[in-house]
Amino acid sequence: MVGLSRLAGGGLLLLLLLALLPLALDGKPAPLPQALPEALAGGTTALRRDVTEEQQQQLVAEESSGPAAGRSDPKIGDGCFGLPLDHIGSVSGLGCNRPVQNRPKQIPGGS
């Protein structure tokens, strides 16, 4: 048997709460849960709007356009990795594996 000192801590309060809980409900049973709405026959695809022919053409045009659309050469212009170089990169040649055409000649001993 559990001692009274142990029940006096938190156990007595729990027993009192459990004993008074039916009185708080006024003897009424808990309400039954409502039924969930039934799903549509087509699932989530039935919720989609119909796409018009014009919208479909726009989607196809957006998918076919982009940064690489219509290119046959991987590089464009004088840039590296298909991107144009800034002034510093074009002078120093950093990031490119080819010689720079308009590189200024360095003067030995100059600052």
UniProtKB/Swiss-Prot annotation:
Subcellular location: Secreted
UniProt-annotated stretches for the region Disordered: 51-77, 92-111
Disulfide bonds: C80-C96
Keywords from the UniProt entry: Disulfide bond, Hypotensive agent, Secreted, Signal, Toxin, Vasoactive, Vasodilator
Family: Belongs to the natriuretic peptide family.
Listed GO CC annotations: extracellular region
Name the record gives this protein: Natriuretic peptide TNP-b
Origin species: Oxyuranus scutellatus scutellatus
InterPro entries, per database record: Natr_peptide, Natr_peptide_CS
Keyword Signal on entry: yes
Expression across tissues: Expressed by the venom gland.
Signal peptide: 1-27
GO molecular function terms noted in the UniProt entry: hormone activity; toxin activity
Protein role: Snake venom natriuretic peptide that exhibits vasoactive and probable hypotensive activity. Is only weakly active on natriuretic peptide receptor-C (NPR3).
Miscellaneous notes: Negative results: does not activate natriuretic peptide receptor 1 (NPR1).
